[in-house]
Amino acid sequence: MNLVLMGLPGAGKGTQGERIVEDYGIPHISTGDMFRAAMKEETPLGLEAKSYIDKGELVPDEVTIGIVKERLGKDDCERGFLLDGFPRTVAQAEALENILEEYGKPIDYVINIKVDKDSLMERLTGRRICSVCGTTYHLVFNPPKTPGVCDKDGGDLYQRADDNEETVSKRLEVNMKQTQPLLDFYSEKGYLVNVNGQQDINDVYKDVKELLGGLSK
């Protein structure tokens, strides 16, 4: 079961990803985790990535793609994988196709958790975080018992600077522009499946499970 998981910020991609890997026993591979592991293991590519990250620069595609190739070649990916956060561009998607062709592991589905912009705005601007323990709340979906106060330790809740309306709106616009060519690429390939992310979390996952039902665990 070889999957790519997509979705704009706030779509609930992380939640669905956790459930998929738990139920199907495949590794959840995110770009950040891959970089951290490669740097910790001090692989040549990991050290190269670190040199860019330490300077605050973007890691070049060839290094990122090399790290992805190393990761997908590990034993725990024999029965499949869930890629999250990669690819981000059509060039990366084409490189991924080449890697998977070499490994004989074609993509089964690219699952896009689809949520409209207004709903994403509500989800992202409603987030509040405890200043003491870091617990995340949401004014609509998961409010604290007492407004502005953490249930666990009474700490003050705050809104992250990048969760305000203007910043969130800009972030979503940028993400939409970047993501659309990738969605078009995978749609043309016949891999793309849109899942309605507007529903309750459990209903979203029910749709995902129905989709994956035809694939062997």
Swiss-Prot record:
Region spans: LID: 126-163
Pfam families, sorted: ADK, ADK_lid
Cross-referenced CDD domains: ADK
Endpoints of the signal sequence: none
Coiled-coil regions listed in the entry: none
Region (NMP): 30-59
Protein localization: Cytoplasm
Keyword presence, DNA repair: no
Domain notes: Consists of three domains, a large central CORE domain and two small peripheral domains, NMPbind and LID, which undergo movements during catalysis. The LID domain closes over the site of phosphoryl transfer upon ATP binding. Assembling and dissambling the active center during each catalytic cycle provides an effective means to prevent ATP hydrolysis. Some bacteria have evolved a zinc-coordinating structure that stabilizes the LID domain.
Similarity annotation: Belongs to the adenylate kinase family.
Descriptive protein name: Adenylate kinase
Organism: Bacillus velezensis (strain DSM 23117 / BGSC 10A6 / LMG 26770 / FZB42) (Bacillus amyloliquefaciens subsp. plantarum)
Native organism taxonomy: Bacteria, Bacillati, Bacillota, Bacilli, Bacillales
